[in-house]
Amino acid sequence: MITIIYSTHKDLNYNKSFKEHLTKSIGVKNFEILEYENFNQYSLAEIYNKGISESKNNIVVCIHNDIRLETGWGKKLLKSFEDNPDYGIIGKAGSCYFPESGIYWEKMGQTMVGQVYHQPEGQKKWLSRYSAKLPELIPVVTI
């Protein structure tokens, strides 16, 4: 029912940990994970398009492998599509406006919502704010 696609340039242990997290947190039995090793030979859009064309399922999740999802997110995602058959896509972060170009940051201003806390291993941590400071975390279904 669900295909999860991600691009990686991380080590094997990191990817193993991420796959285990997806498997334990998704909350459904019918899913596939498509991992694409990518050392800058393809754009992220090319990887996602490749995964979508190779997917065996009608619901596809394009995800970064450095996030964590709450337990049961797959059930919630399926329910969202079941309750809203006119939905074609559900997103987590970025913008409340999607320009024709597909470049979400093209018109940042008031359309951007959210903040991203960066924590690269062995490097300085920082916060990117795409909107005013949020009073609390915003619960989401998927990315």
Residue ranges of model-derived segments:
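A recurrent flexible, glycine/aromatic-enriched loop bordering the glycosyltransferase active site
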Residues: 122-143
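Short aromatic/hydrophobic "clamp" motif used to bind/position activated sugar donors
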Residues: 60
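A short beta-strand-loop structural module common to alpha/beta enzyme folds
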Residues: 30-42
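The conserved acidic donor/metal-binding loop of glycosyltransferases
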Residues: 64-68
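Conserved donor NDP-sugar-binding/catalytic core segment of glycosyltransferases
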Residues: 41, 72-112
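N-proximal low-complexity "stem/linker" segments adjacent to membrane-targeting elements
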Residues: 1-24, 32-35
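Glycine-rich, basic loop-to-helix element that forms the pyrophosphate-binding segment
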Residues: 39-55
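Short alpha-helix within the catalytic core of nucleotide-sugar-dependent glycosyltransferases
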Residues: 19, 49, 57, 71-82
